[in-house]
Design a protein with these regions (language model features):
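C-terminal transmembrane beta-barrel domains of outer membrane proteins
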Residues: 96-228
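Transmembrane beta-strand segments of outer-membrane beta-barrel domains in Gram-negative
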Residues: 1-145, 211
C-alpha cells in the first residue's frame, strides 16, 4: 500500500501597471510553502519528505492584436527556493528528502529556475482559428518533484497520461486548429444559442521535451509527441 501526500500554501501580491482593452501589463510576487511525502504500509514507513519555501517574481502581459485579429497572453517567472526558511529543507535535505541525489536523501531546499508561457488564439476566418500554446522551464539545479516540469496529461502532451515524464528542464508546444459549429449550420441549435456557440471541433499536434540530471552526472532526456 503506497500513499502520497502533497500540500501547497501560497500568498502573492498582484499589481496591474497598464490596463486597456488592447494591452495589459502586470507583475506578481509571491511566497509559497510546499510539502510532498510518500508513505508505505499505511504510514508505517516513509520514503522521505520534500519541504520547500519558494519566492517568485512574475511579469505578465496580455492583450488584443487588433491588426492581425488575435488574443495573446505571455508570462515569465523567476523562482527561488530558500534553504531552511519556514520549515524548508537545509543544504543537505535534512538527510530525509523524498527526491534523491545520487541515491541519497540529500536534496537541498535551495534552487533557481526560470519558467515562461505564451498562448495565442488567432482568428483565421469566421469559422476557423488557430491556438498556439508554449511553456518552458530552465534550471541548472536538480529539482524536487514539486518543481519539475510535467509532460503528459490534458494540459500538455495529451497522448500520454499525466506525469509521463518530469524534468528539471523542459518545453511544451502545441498547435490546434479550431472549427466552430457555424461552419456546419448557421441555424439556432436551441434557445438563443447557435451552433457556433455550442459546438467546436479541434485538431491538434503536441510536442514536449524534458531533461534531468540525477546528481551523479547522468543525464536523462525524453521527447513526447501526439496528435488528435
Amino acid at each position: 500500500n503506497i500513499e502520497g501526500d502533497t500540500e501547497i500554501a501560497d500568498a502573492y501580491l498582484y499589481s496591474r501597471w497598464k490596463n486597456s482593452r488592447a494591452f495589459n501589463l502586470a507583475t506578481q510576487i509571491g511566497l509559497s510553502t510546499k510539502r510532498a511525502e510518500v508513505e508505505f504500509f499505511d504510514g508505517g514507513f516513509s520514503d522521505g519528505v520534500d519541504r520547500l519555501t519558494v519566492a517568485t517574481a512574475s511579469l505578465i502581459a496580455e492583450g488584443v492584436d487588433e491588426r492581425f485579429r488575435g488574443l495573446y497572453r505571455g508570462s515569465i517567472t523567476f523562482h527561488k527556493g530558500l534553504n531552511d526558511v519556514l520549515g524548508s529543507m537545509d543544504e543537505t535535505g535534512n538527510n530525509n528528502s523524498l527526491t534523491k541525489v545520487g541515491g541519497a536523501p540529500t536534496l537541498e531546499g535551495g534552487f533557481s529556475k526560470l519558467t515562461s508561457t505564451y498562448n495565442r488564439l488567432q482568428t483565421v476566418s469566421r469559422h476557423h482559428s488557430l491556438l498556439l500554446l508554449f511553456a518552458g522551464q530552465y534550471s541548472d539545479d536538480q529539482l524536487s518533484s514539486l518543481e519539475k516540469m510535467s509532460l503528459g496529461g490534458p494540459y500538455t502532451v495529451r497522448a500520454y497520461p499525466t506525469g509521463e515524464f518530469t524534468g528539471d528542464r523542459g518545453l511544451f508546444t502545441s498547435l490546434g486548429w479550431i472549427i466552430n459549429g457555424g461552419l456546419f449550420s448557421d441555424s439556432i441549435a436551441f434557445g438563443d444559442y447557435g451552433w457556433s456557440d455550442i459546438l467546436s471541433v479541434t485538431v491538434f499536434a503536441d510536442y514536449g521535451w524534458g531533461k534531468n540530471r540525477d546528481g551523479s552526472g547522468a543525464v536523462e532526456r525524453q521527447e513526447l509527441s501526439g496528435a488528435g
